[in-house]
Amino acid sequence: MSNAKELYDRWLAQPDLDDAIKAELVSVAGNDEAITDRFYRDLEFGTGGLRGVIGAGTNRMNLYTVRKATQGLADYLNATDLPKKVAIAHDSRHNGELFARETARVLAANGITAYMYPRLEPTPALSWAVRYLGCGAGVCVTASHNPAKYNGYKVYGADGCQITLEAAEKILAAIEKIDCFDGVRLVDYDKALADGSIVMIDDKCLNDFVQAVYDQRVGDGAGIDALKLVYTPLNGTGLECVNKLLQKLGVTHVTVVPEQEKPDGDFPTCPYPNPEIREAMQKGLELCDKVHPDLLLGTDPDCDRCGTAVPDGKGGYRLITGNEMGLILLDYICRTRLAQGTMPADPVAVTTIVSTDMATPVAKKYGVELRRTLTGFKFIGEQIGKLEAEGRADRYIFGFEESYGYLSGAHVRDKDAVNATLLVCEAAAWYAQQGKTLLDAIEALYKEFGYFRNALCSFAFEGESGMHTMQNLMKNLRANTPAEIAGYKVDSAVDYDTDGTGLPRANVLEYHLAGGHKLMVRPSGTEPKIKIYLSAVGESEAAADAVNAALAEAAAAMMKV
């Protein structure tokens, strides 16, 4: 507590402290727990950049922690041969524009040209801008699908991918040398705008991004203009780019969920604006009951994840999971490109270790090499980069992860919900031409390859004590490999935090169970949670789901919840 209290006192004593920060610090005076939580550590910087609760202190997202991180990024960039240009974007979250401007001010003060989108834009549009403008790095101010109290600071490399571990460690080393009050260079925003050290990204860049997505069309587009859609941007950034794309595709029957149409950092209709969660899609589902569309599409606040619902044949709508949509799109892309003669030689698809095992037989059917990476789309982007370095970026046909991230082209290096919108609409139209829905598509795949069913259990551990609990749980699991889980014998266990997996070391444990089932344990890289991924295979959906239900109970016991 003593160190936290010293930091608290130092912050409070700053002569020009931001009024909102000062008011918050004054409000917690004498509250040791509140002070400790704000100051017991620096907000962790890693390959995902920064992410945390907005507020006062070293363990919060605020203009001082953002400035400090940016000074570290600037010092890193100025020590390399990379272009001294950085692209910046932000989403609809609280303080998003403020943090983007502060980022630009620090970069400009360090001789680095800051290119800013003039309004909020999707994360994939930031990845695009980095490559399009020839930048040395990029920053996207976003906390993706986290609750409203969060914001974040994602850093991208010159390739448009989120930074590598090596780059993150170098930036962190630079950050750790900086005092957030005395060690940061700043310029006046308006002055920097006038002298050209801060530049607004023009509309051509964004329009060319939408065109690049449109150019990823796989089929001939037959029937796509007949599609009837309900769309929700979940009060985030997706509306502009998704609308532009749908217009290019000729999809004109679009109803936007009115309560979720405009950007709103409070996310008033859903506390957790994540299209993976039914609650976030509920307003869209209610609208579907009134207008009866062919598809419901929902994009998260920074428009890199896309959720979908389709008619269930019983008068309602069923949400398609991220794994299911990944399989539908993988199958659609493969069969269509083979039929049209556009499949490259030695095609490659990429997914992650926590995504469905069913992708393996689907890829094999079409002669596609399936590569698996660690969790995080940056690793999928890294695989595209490796193919590009070999002069064979064309080999990449599709990448997906179970958390609703998809990408079918090399135009960006992060998951892209605008690209996903294109693919889902194409696939839905193709099946509609045959009198089928995407639900029929996944059911046909289940019947062909078996019912691979997946589920996710998340266990939250808040605050300093929660972090220690998470560390101890992982330590105990490593020391005591279970003999069985939910009555299924553990045939083998893999610890990804060791050498020999063929992948970079990661804090992930994998248990292969009798019957072909699987359970994986992984602390989240962006939230104070441990995630447990369940995978079951059965002769029917009900049989596989029953196994996952038993595994979920066992997972809760493992977490002592």
Locate predicted features:
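Phosphate-binding and adjacent anionic-ligand microenvironments
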Residues: 289, 293-295, 316-318, 336-522, ...
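An N-terminal, well-structured beta->alpha segment
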Residues: 3-103, 110, 192-193, 198-226, ...
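Conserved phosphate/anionic-ligand binding catalytic regions in large, soluble enzymes, centered on
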Residues: 39-59, 143-144, 229, 233-245, ...
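Short acidic, glycine/serine/threonine-rich loops at helix termini
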Residues: 97-102, 127-131, 149-155, 176, ...
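Gly/Ser/Thr-enriched, mixed-charge loops and adjacent short helices
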Residues: 16, 34-39, 43, 151-280, ...
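N-terminal small/polar loop signature for handling phosphorylated ligands or for N-terminal nucleophile
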Residues: 87-150, 248-308
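Glycine-rich phosphate-binding loop plus the immediately following alpha-helix
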Residues: 156-186, 323-347, 351-362, 417
